[in-house]
Amino acid sequence: MRFSDSVVLIFGGTTGIGLMTTIDFIIHNTSHIILASRSKWKWKRAIEKIQNIFGDLVNLSNEFNISVLNSTVEYIPCDIRIENDVKQTIQKTIDKYHYINVYFNNAGIQPTTGHTDGDITEIEIPSEKLFDGTIVYKISQNNSNNDNLNNDNSNNDNSSVCSTPASSYCENPIATFIMGMTFCLKHEVKFALEQKSNIPVSIINMSSRNGVNIPSSDRPIYSACKAFIHSMTQTIATQSAKLGIEKNRSIRVNCIAPGPILTPLEIPIFLPDKKNVFEPLSNLELQQFQEIGSHGVPMKRTGTTNEISPTVLFLADYNQSSYITGSTITIDGGYTASPLIG
């Protein structure tokens, strides 16, 4: 069986592409799948989605663990913006299962409100220099009364001026995509070099079409941060290959760059009036999403999550992609290949 001995850690695996990838790993008999994310309520929702697909084959072991077919799926609360969260999540997983051979760095945000992206003259990143010379950058946590930001019905997630309709956390692309990705790659490579089991390790990063060669002028910070992920994939792949040779380890680092995909994170971009992005779209909303989202896409449509997840599994599978590292695969209906198509 394809992934029968695999331990897969997905940062951001409870919704959208991450959840679809989780489902695909279950279908392919992955032994252990660990989902690390900030919102426990999204984990509960993910369980419901998995139950809708697999029905009575899903067994709830406890509130943080389910078993499905030949797989166990476990939830670990983790905020990748906090380095110790990342380190402890990986450490807990290795302590329990002894190794991790697939990492999917999929935690994502779509800043649509506040001052974390958009007009460069309006962006706010509070900073100050302390008496000892330390420079501190702050992520604000001001409360917001915007109903679009309160879809979780949870008292644990604090709404803020930089939240999004998909999350009531403060959504700063620099904190998640630059700091968070750096923390993930640092500890993934470190643990991959140190873990006892000498098995191939695949690290897959999530970038975007806007991070490859067509940045969004409406979201310069988001685009630049996604370009950072593309660049880091190449440099860390090179480092990991060299370090792996020294320690007799196979560590591959690759990246995917999707185009417009129907997910809770993408809906606010094309349907800004949609109040709850976790509810199914009406036929009219789906038509509007397709029309707006497919602008510039030669295939004249948006994509779906099940058109992304097979590429993640391909890169995760050493038998199929053992000579691929440092690559970014665009999955965008031809958008980046034909940027002038309207």
Swiss-Prot record:
Gene Ontology MF terms: oxidoreductase activity, acting on the CH-OH group of donors, NAD or NADP as acceptor
InterPro entries the record matches: NAD(P)-bd_dom_sf (IPR036291), SDR_fam (IPR002347)
Top-level taxon: Viruses
Keyword annotations of the record: Oxidoreductase
Binding site for substrate: S208
Similarity comment text for this entry: Belongs to the short-chain dehydrogenases/reductases (SDR) family.
Protein name: Uncharacterized short-chain type dehydrogenase/reductase R419
Active site: Y222
Binding positions (NADP(+)): 9-31
EC number: 1.-.-.-
